[in-house]
């Protein structure tokens, strides 16, 4: 079984076209790409509503609505003229085999990073971030984590494959440094003694964006950063199509402004996860995810253009 694919060898979940109508490249390791997009159609680790395996397809589908804008507002340049971005399709694995997915995703990421590429990944449920962190830590060493979510995902329930345990496991494996990591938008129960800085949704909504970004920069410092965005960080009014929605979240406007504010960080890997299109309304969740992913690429392009 191949590692990467498209709708003809993985017809349940993938697309024939790339994110933002970018070129598809199923051999990205030898390409001249700066950033490689990988879909991870996996939702076996979810504790809420299933369907996140269809997230990558939904994000790609709605991203066609974003492809027409060249000098994107408010950046006033075209990201595609500064970054070489390709979409390598979806990870292909035996559906029902969480271990195979994890091992194949980590191996794929390690191969890309060794070839000098950077990764933007689409989940799938949030568990997919753990094998990505393992690969990135092998390449970059211990990292800071900037994590947007309604949940901290630091729960120790003893389950090997669970979308609520990754950031309990990752510090224990030495992948991330919680003392240089920040979790944004949290509005569920969390452990206050694990080293992470938690900026709950209430204070994120009440404080100024510049104030929050200044604090994030101070916490992270100059460490390599992994950026992960669980779409349930947004209020369900803006992102109903997700497995574990929680009211009282961020607006899409505030989330975009916060992501733009991360431009000066040393971001080495990124993902957007937990889009479950079966529960979406008029594709607004997928559109929010696609827009946030595009903004992530724009902050990389902005740095390259400086």
From Swiss-Prot:
The UniProt keyword set, sorted, is:
Hydrolase, Manganese, Metal-binding, Polyamine biosynthesis, Putrescine biosynthesis, Spermidine biosynthesis
Q: Which cofactor does it need?
A: Mn(2+)
Classification via Pfam families:
Arginase (PF00491)
Q: Which InterPro entries match?
A: Agmatinase, Agmatinase-rel, Ureohydrolase, Ureohydrolase_dom_sf, Ureohydrolase_Mn_BS
Biological pathway: Amine and polyamine biosynthesis; putrescine biosynthesis via agmatine pathway; putrescine from agmatine: step 1/1
The enzyme's main class, written as a single word, is hydrolase
Catalytic activity line of the entry: agmatine + H2O = urea + putrescine
Q: Which GO terms describe its biological process?
A: putrescine biosynthetic process from arginine, via agmatine; spermidine biosynthetic process
Q: Does the keyword Manganese apply?
A: yes
Picking any one GO molecular function of the record gives: agmatinase activity
EC annotation?
3.5.3.11
Give the residues the record marks as binding Mn(2+). 126, 149, 151, 153, 230, 232
Member of which family? Belongs to the arginase family. Agmatinase subfamily.
Query: What function does this protein fulfil?
Result: Catalyzes the formation of putrescine from agmatine.
The protein depicted here goes by the name Agmatinase
Q: Which gene encodes it?
A: speB
